[in-house]
A protein has these predicted regions:
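An accessory alpha-helical subdomain
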Residues: 137-202
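Proline/glycine-rich low-complexity loops and linkers
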Residues: 34-41, 48-51, 63-65, 72, ...
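Short glycine-rich or small-residue beta-strand-to-loop segments that form or flank ligand, phosphate
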Residues: 4-12, 62-68, 139-141
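Glycine-rich phosphate/diphosphate-binding loop of Rossmann-like nucleotide-binding domains
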Residues: 1-44
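Surface-exposed charge patches
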Residues: 27, 132, 185
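Short, well-ordered coil/turn elements that cap or connect secondary structure elements
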Residues: 31, 118, 188-191
Length: 202
């Protein structure tokens, strides 16, 4: 299984926020034997969200989008994903009922806006916050708040299944240049992927 991750948020592009969500998802998917083929960071722009999601939807087995959910002016992910699949958006009664059951702000217009999802989307309840996630075809859309995203991914994790892999980390106190021949020998003789990552101990 090959997955594309799309991280939405102006703050990720300006460096105000570190993209920990993509790193966390990468580790979770790797542990499930799933390959992450691409991570893309894009702004809170409806047209750009639609373009990238449409592109990755066609290229990957599944797309995970994080960020841009909610009723504020810069939360454009719902509309962008809907456009990527040629769908409109609509008030989602099940999402509103869920929000009513867990939110003290259920009567506010702020929460009304949060219950708008693409037509035909499968709602993913938010057990930690308010804004629901959703699924459209092979596209999974999760909140950008890490705690909320973590919880929601745990609910859908069984839907991501790949080939089991083993990862072994070997620390060697030698310059990277001294390892080139041995790395090439490993790659030639065995069906493995080898990465070299210089650090304090190399």
């Amino acid at each position: 299984m090959r997955v594309a991750i799309v991280s939405v948020g102006d703050e990720l592009l300006t460096g105000e926020t570190v993209n920990t969500n993509a790193a966390w998802l990468g580790r979770q998917l790797r542990d499930r034997g799933v390959t992450v083929g691409r991570v893309t960071v894009i702004p809170d722009d409806q047209q750009e969200i639609a373009r990238v999601v449409n592109e990755q939807h066609a290229a990957a087995d599944a797309v995970i989008v994080t960020g841009g959910l909610g009723p504020t002016h810069d939360d454009r992910t719902v509309e962008g994903v809907a456009a990527a699949f040629g769908r409109s958006v609509e008030f989602h009664e099940a999402a509103r009922e869920w929000i009513d059951s867990i939110s003290e702000y259920a009567a506010s217009d702020l929460v009304d806006g949060t219950a708008v999802l693409p037509t035909g989307a499968r709602q993913l309840p938010n057990q930690v916050g308010v804004a629901p996630g959703f699924v459209v075809e092979n596209c999974y859309v999760l909140p950008g708040v890490p705690e909320e995203m973590h919880q929601m991914f745990e609910e859908i994790a069984p839907e991501f299944v790949g080939e089991p892999t083993n990862v072994t980390v070997v620390e060697i106190a030698e310059p990277e240049s001294a390892l080139l021949e041995r790395i090439e020998q490993l790659r030639t003789e065995f069906p493995v992927s080898v990465g070299s990552y210089p650090g304090d101990n190399v």
